Regions:
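Positively charged, polar, low-complexity stretches
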Residues: 1-83
Length: 83
């Protein structure tokens, strides 16, 4: 699966979590926080490529990006690119 996320799409971190959970079919128990994000991303078993465009380099969204990159280091099925 290929997914492009544009940082300008999300007015807040909750919108991001809801959108990503929907797109990647995260389980109902997904807690919409950074720990849950990491857990769900490292559990992905299908090849998944996520491209981050216009991504904020500070604040909550920057922390999300770091968590996604950390998860990609642990999961060979996940690739994160920042444009």
């Amino acid at each position: 699966m290929k997914l492009t996320l544009n940082g300008t799409w999300f007015g807040n971190i909750c919108q991001f979590h809801n959108y990503l959970a929907n797109q990647l079919h995260f389980p109902a128990w997904y807690g919409r926080n950074l720990d849950a994000l990491y857990d769900c991303l490292t559990d992905l078993s299908a090849d998944t490529e996520i491209s981050l465009q216009n991504w904020p380099q500070t604040g909550a969204m920057a922390r999300v990006m770091r968590v996604m990159q950390d998860a990609a280091e642990e999961n060979p099925h996940l690739q994160i690119s920042v444009m």
